Amino acid sequence: MLKSLTRHNIPKEHPRDNSLKIRANLSDSFDNGIISQFGLIAHGRGEAFDYILGETTPKISLKTIHVATAQLLLSDSVISVNGNSAALCAKSIVQLANLTNSKIEINLFHKSKTRANKISQLLKKHGAKDVYGLNTKYLTKIPGLKSNRKYIDKRGIFLSDVIFVPLEDGDRTEFLKKMNKTVITVDLNPLSRTSAMSDITIVDNLVRVLPEMIKQSRNMSNLSESDLQKIIKKFNNKKQLNLILKYMSKRLIDLST
């Protein structure tokens, strides 16, 4: 059925039009070697949490997006890209990188040179000039991390202050923090290790987050460094996660009555 929908266009009248288009895109991206089979599983897990959010961005998450955008504008930052984020939002990633003067670096858990090159080509198709994380000459390791995501670019993540890692895994977040990096993540699961360990956790769907960050980057581009610092200083990630958990709990209670 998914292949049929991909070929014949999903009708706009379908109540889950956007979700089906995303699934079809991911299915095609798997066939094209952009994402791994594990990426499909990860997306399904996230989609379950998006149902609880009502497939909309809560006001609580909008506040976190505001803080995350301020942090990117203020810092020497890198957007870390994996297969799913590239498949879902390659164009938006490039736009956000340009607006915030962030570097783009590919980092894969299920490492494949072929897949990394395909992701790079996709990003460059949407206007990316430099994509880091491909040239083994410049790769180094995150101290202590054992998975394939330990490899980072000396010119990118290694040098940067802030790492924006949508769809991240908890292990790498932990070790990036040990390197004194500020970690921003997008995770639909507020209970994950990544959510708990990151400095700024946006609980929302990446396909909604990035367009909002692009919008806010444009709106905030003229703010002074001190104004951006004030926005960040007031933020408490643990408090925001507690608020989003309460929001999701209330949603479930309301739906059950």
Listing of model-derived features with the role each one plays in the protein:
Residues 63, 139-158, 164-171:
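Active-site glycine-rich loop that binds ribose-phosphate moieties when present
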Residues 193-257:
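C-terminal functional extensions of proteins
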Residues 99-149:
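Long, charge-dense
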Residues 12-67, 115-122:
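Short, compositionally biased "basic patch" segments
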Residues 170-191:
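A short, gly/pro- and small-residue-rich
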Residues 64-77, 94-100:
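Glycine-rich phosphate/diphosphate-binding loops that line cofactor/substrate pockets in enzymes
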Residues 81-91, 110-114, 168-171:
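Gly/Ser/Thr-rich loops at beta-strand to alpha-helix junctions
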Residues 75-82, 103-108:
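Short glycine-rich or small-residue beta-strand-to-loop segments that form or flank ligand, phosphate
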